[in-house]
């Protein structure tokens, strides 16, 4: 499924709700898209729990620019998917995920250069990669195949 992941930008988090659960966040100004930044855009397999697990391991996709997926992060499911997850935005809560209204167009974009990621058997996706050797290597490392 195609997803975007958004994390609070500490410099823009005026209500200091980074890593706080949904109820606390609501009591302190709500989930404000303008305080978030996109840290991943791409395709992953599985459901929301699988996404949480994937982005808490060293094997997360090479274009991921965030910290381990945590409470207060937002996962946006884009379009239809084989898992039957309703497209929309999901707040990562203390336990599970809460469907929320979230205008991702108000979030800051990812850092780096724009890149078209083409993977076998998947729809191409535009993403961003930081302009340093390590980030560029990680972005393509999972997608290179030997040809003889």
Task: Give each language-model segment a name.
Residues 2-5, 62-64, 95:
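Cysteine-nucleophile amide-bond enzymes
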Residues 143-148:
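Non-Sec secretion/translocation targeting segments of pathogen effectors
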Residues 109-140:
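N-terminal low-complexity, intrinsically disordered segments
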Residues 1-44:
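Extended boundary segments
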Residues 33-82:
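Short, conserved turn/kink motifs that form compact alpha/beta structural patches or helix kinks used as
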Residues 1-4, 88, 109-116:
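Short structural boundary motif marking the start of a folded domain
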Residues 1, 6-12, 75-84, 118-122:
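Short, flexible beta-strand-to-coil junctions
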Residues 66-107:
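Short, compact, well-ordered microdomains
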